[in-house]
């Protein structure tokens, strides 16, 4: 939304009418411009949900052509200005290797209040359940043993990782491979 003129038209009306609503915005942090920052400074209460599905190169793969350094810089700027900061995180086959690093990264930002996580089920091939159990289980175990996973902000994520860890369900690995080939072409 930070690049959409329509959002700024609405925010302009709010400012012109001297209103002070609580604003809630979700952003993938790829673009945080000066105009957006000025609006964040105006509102006394703001909830910003950072849509971030990985750490470092994993995020760059999932959100190509994004650059993690830019996303991290923008997330830090937003965290300093917003009154409430959360992360929306999608657990998927493409970030399961990166869970431990992601948990550590989130833990370093003291302003992040909560990680709202979901397990992806579509498109076909993206769920961690498409990965073989003997591959995914050690990765999930590593994340579940992370010293930070017991912090309140990770409650839902921990429940979902535990579910995946205990699951004996395995979907068609070829669906994951075929989808990956399609993604890698683009």
Which positions does each model-derived feature cover?
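A structural motif corresponding to the C-terminal end of an alpha-helix
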Residues: 17, 43, 74-85, 109, ...
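C-terminal accessory regions of radical SAM enzymes
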Residues: 107-186
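Catalytic cores of alpha/beta
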Residues: 93-109
